[in-house]
């Protein structure tokens, strides 16, 4: 039984690596989002002829500035899409870990054995539920981020500072991945390592 639990713990170590990768991606995602939303907020002001003061005497300055900012915004949105692909890779890894966990559970035919505990070690049911929750959390957060990216693209045409602020809160907060719940899962799985 201990050998089986060690296999599960290996899966959770891989999951922890994916979560660290996710967190690094999250830092990039937040930075890209903030930069893109700053440009979106400025675009409306840039299209106001009164904003250029003495620079209005330069022919085409307004169009040039707006074009340059739109180019930067396109680049940021492309980078955000690339980060989304990397987030999706993490989701697929969690899906595979969960699928592998289901196969491991199938090997253990007896219900009693699936719920059996040895000391503080987790039972197989704890392990499978933990992987399932981690997969669901990251998949849900990926879908939220995907929706945020779509909404951000729509806000280019009609920017709203209130909407951008609300989206920024969601981007930073990651509401689908509550840190205390994630920590609890790892505390259960690695209980014997906690000192």
UniProtKB/Swiss-Prot annotation:
One cellular component (GO) term of this entry: nuclear envelope
Domain of life per record: Eukaryota
A Pfam family it matches: CA109-like
InterPro entries per record: CA109-like, OPRN-like
Protein name: Uncharacterized protein At5g43822
Taxonomic lineage: Eukaryota, Viridiplantae, Streptophyta, Embryophyta, Tracheophyta
């Amino acid at each position: 039984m201990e050998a089986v639990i060690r296999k599960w713990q290996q899966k959770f170590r891989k999951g922890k690596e994916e979560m660290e990768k996710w967190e690094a991606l999250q830092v990039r995602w937040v930075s890209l989002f903030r930069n893109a939303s700053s440009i979106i907020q400025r675009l409306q002001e840039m299209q106001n002829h009164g904003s250029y003061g003495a620079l209005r005497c330069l022919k085409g300055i307004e169009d040039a500035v707006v074009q340059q900012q739109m180019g930067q915004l396109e680049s940021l949105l492309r980078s955000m899409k690339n980060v989304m692909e990397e987030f999706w890779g993490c989701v697929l890894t969690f899906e595979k870990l969960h699928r592998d966990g289901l196969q491991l559970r199938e090997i253990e035919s007896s219900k009693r054995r699936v719920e059996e505990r040895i000391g503080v070690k987790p039972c197989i049911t704890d392990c499978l539920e933990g992987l399932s929750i981690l997969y669901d959390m990251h998949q849900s957060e990926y879908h939220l981020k995907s929706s945020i990216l779509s909404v951000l693209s729509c806000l280019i045409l009609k920017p709203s500072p209130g909407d951008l602020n609300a989206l920024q809160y969601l981007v930073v907060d990651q509401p689908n991945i509550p840190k205390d719940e994630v920590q609890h899962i790892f505390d259960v799985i690695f209980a014997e390592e906690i000192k």
